[in-house]
């Protein structure tokens, strides 16, 4: 095998590979030998089928597998000799026929990391906020646990219901006197004041006493997830069957034991531990970002288009996921995909720059991600999402996402190395935490059970 390489651009290479007839012959014969051990042909015992019969019966498959195997061997060999790591899938052009007695020439093109001088990344100074968890935060989680385990009891009187209470209602929507499909329910428990429903709907429910009916105009916002309702105003008819309030359980050791812990004190410790671990990770990530931002200010290089596109697709997928959890969609933003991509371009470029820098550090430091590490990561993802591990692994391989995952894991290792070699100075938190982090605290009770 001979090859010649050229740089098409600072981030793209082209390699022409020429194979001698002997290599083609050896690859075909090797594939036939593998077939001989596994295929069955009528009239022959398994493993005793002549090579000529096997080649005649399975010629197309054998030649294609032999061709691909030879290309894979060559690519691995060339990458090692060139000391490069493709960033995405390879474009392979094979104009020559693959057959006995002839050589085989083909071309591969692929993107690579740009070459640039790495800035000094060892011994950098960075500040990291200390972790502080106060009693108020712990109490907020305890209050939420009590609220989630509360009993619903009827309130005295006819109401109407107010914020903090739960109204059990029947409702149905009408437009021009006709029922609106899909907007109807019976014995629906609506917790008032918790933004579970449209403001107009909650306001209507708060005007109707227990046992009575009422109706009013309800306006659906323009970005409502159900496209057929977005922007419409309908007549909502409501009947209130019951008005209830929560009766909180006692905060005692029995409650703690129902959560898998010995006592209230152990429950508080588990909540504090959960907050501490979460906040430590957040503070560490903030310090790492500060280190990375400092390094990126010192370098300039061309960005590989495929890397930018990968970051763009990730950003769009993340945004779509966030909107879906809010009951919305990308279309609800009122922007075309072209406009969304334009808005996100600076962020995608910056993420790609960070990836290039970190992968370059990983290469210099000789860092690597093993197949076992990649497999473990995919397995953990399958466990979180409930997907079949084997199917998910095959999906990653078919789509080429396995290379994206490998590069991300490698970049993470490089970031961890830079952080480990930095001079980290702990400082007091700049400001008290807002309620945003507390929104994640329902998971704290689960973490509490896991930490027993």
From Swiss-Prot:
One of its GO terms (cellular component) is cytoplasm. NCBIfam families: tig. It catalyses: [protein]-peptidylproline (omega=180) = [protein]-peptidylproline (omega=0). It comes from the Bacteria. HAMAP family: Trigger_factor_Tig (MF_00303). One of its GO terms (biological process) is cell division. The gene is tig. Consists of 3 domains; the N-terminus binds the ribosome, the middle domain has PPIase activity, while the C-terminus has intrinsic chaperone activity on its own. Residues 164-249 form the PPIase FKBP-type domain. It is found in: Cytoplasm. Its main location: cytoplasm. Belongs to the FKBP-type PPIase family. Tig subfamily. This is Trigger factor. Pfam families: FKBP_C, Trigger_C, Trigger_N. Residues 432-452 have a biased composition (Low complexity). Involved in protein export. Acts as a chaperone by maintaining the newly synthesized protein in an open conformation. Functions as a peptidyl-prolyl cis-trans isomerase. Residues 426-452 are annotated as: Disordered. Its EC number is 5.2.1.8. Keywords: Cell cycle, Cell division, Chaperone, Cytoplasm, Isomerase, Rotamase. GO terms for molecular function: peptidyl-prolyl cis-trans isomerase activity; protein folding chaperone; ribosome binding.
């Amino acid at each position: 095998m001979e090859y010649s390489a050229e740089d098409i651009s600072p981030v793209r290479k082209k390699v022409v590979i020429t194979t001698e007839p002997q290599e083609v012959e050896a690859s075909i014969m090797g594939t036939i030998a593998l077939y001989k051990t596994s295929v069955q042909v009528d009239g022959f015992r398994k493993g005793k089928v002549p090579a000529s019969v096997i080649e005649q019966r399975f010629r197309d498959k054998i030649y294609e597998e032999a061709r691909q195997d030879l290309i894979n061997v060559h690519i691995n060999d060339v990458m090692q000799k060139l000391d490069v790591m493709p960033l995405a899938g390879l474009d392979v052009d094979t104009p020559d026929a693959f057959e006995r007695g002839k050589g085989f020439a083909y071309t591969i093109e692929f993107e690579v990391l740009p070459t640039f001088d790495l800035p000094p990344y060892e011994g950098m100074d960075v500040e990291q906020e200390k972790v502080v968890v106060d009693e108020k935060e712990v109490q907020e989680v305890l209050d939420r646990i009590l609220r989630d385990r509360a009993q619903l009891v009827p309130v005295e009187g006819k109401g109407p219901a107010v914020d903090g209470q739960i109204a059990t209602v029947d409702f149905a929507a009408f437009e021009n006197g006709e029922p609106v499909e899909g907007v109807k329910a019976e014995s629906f428990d609506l917790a008032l004041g918790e933004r579970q429903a449209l403001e107009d709907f909650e306001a209507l429910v708060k005007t109707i006493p227990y046992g009575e009916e009422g109706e009013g105009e309800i306006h659906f916002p323009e970005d409502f997830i159900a496209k057929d309702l977005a922007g419409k105003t309908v007549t909502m008819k409501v009947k209130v069957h019951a008005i209830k309030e929560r009766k909180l359980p006692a905060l005692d050791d029995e409650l703690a034991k129902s959560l898998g812990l010995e006592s209230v004190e152990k429950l508080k410790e588990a909540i504090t531990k959960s907050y501490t671990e979460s906040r430590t990770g957040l503070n560490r990530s903030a310090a790492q970002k500060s280190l990375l931002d400092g390094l990126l200010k010192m370098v300039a290089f061309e960005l590989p288009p495929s890397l930018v596109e990968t970051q763009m697709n990730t950003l769009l997928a993340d945004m779509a996921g966030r909107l879906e959890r809010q009951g919305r969609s990308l279309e609800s933003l009122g922007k075309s995909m072209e406009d969304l991509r334009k808005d996100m371009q600076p962020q995608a470029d910056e993420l790609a720059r960070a990836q290039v820098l970190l992968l370059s550090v990983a290469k210099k430091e000789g860092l690597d991600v093993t197949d076992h590490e990649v497999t473990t990561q995919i397995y953990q993802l399958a466990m979180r999402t409930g997907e079949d591990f084997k199917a998910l692994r095959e999906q990653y391989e078919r789509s080429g996402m396995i290379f994206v995952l490998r590069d991300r894991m490698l970049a993470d290792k490089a970031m961890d190395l830079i952080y480990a070699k930095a001079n980290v100075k702990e400082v007091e938190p700049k400001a008290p935490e807002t309620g945003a982090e507390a929104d994640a605290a329902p998971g704290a009770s689960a973490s509490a059970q896991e930490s027993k």
